[in-house]
Amino acid sequence: MDNQNIRIRLKAYDHRVLDNSTKEIVNTAKRTGARVRGPIPLPTHIEKFTVNRSPHVDKKSREQFEIRTHRRLLDIVEPTPQTVDALMKLDLAAGVDVEIKL
């Protein structure tokens, strides 16, 4: 490909699954002859939910839940056509959201 970069953003709730998927992508890209920048850990997005413990009374008694979204960024510099084919065929774990920009 003519001087292009592929930017891959990964999101997951479990950081271990995310790191394994990141390693798979990096190994695949390096094996096919592309240079990889990253993985760059992006800030973890924490979404908190506060709910009452009881159904009707005791406003002061509450419980908090949170969802943590872990994110990583990868840049593949000067990808070869073999790199693009290998990345298309790559089967990542369930629960990992992948965004690809050229």
Swiss-Prot record:
Function of the protein: Involved in the binding of tRNA to the ribosomes.
InterPro entries documented for this protein: Ribosomal_uS10, Ribosomal_uS10_CS, Ribosomal_uS10_dom, Ribosomal_uS10_dom_sf
GO BP annotations listed: translation
Species per Swiss-Prot/TrEMBL record: Gluconacetobacter diazotrophicus (strain ATCC 49037 / DSM 5601 / CCUG 37298 / CIP 103539 / LMG 7603 / PAl5)
Highest classification ranks of the organism: Bacteria, Pseudomonadati, Pseudomonadota, Alphaproteobacteria, Acetobacterales
Family: Belongs to the universal ribosomal protein uS10 family.
Pfam families: Ribosomal_S10
GO cellular component: ribonucleoprotein complex; ribosome
SMART domains linked to this entry: Ribosomal_S10 (SM01403)
The protein's name in its UniProt record: Small ribosomal subunit protein uS10
Quaternary structure (record): Part of the 30S ribosomal subunit.
Domain of life: Bacteria
The entry's keywords: Ribonucleoprotein, Ribosomal protein
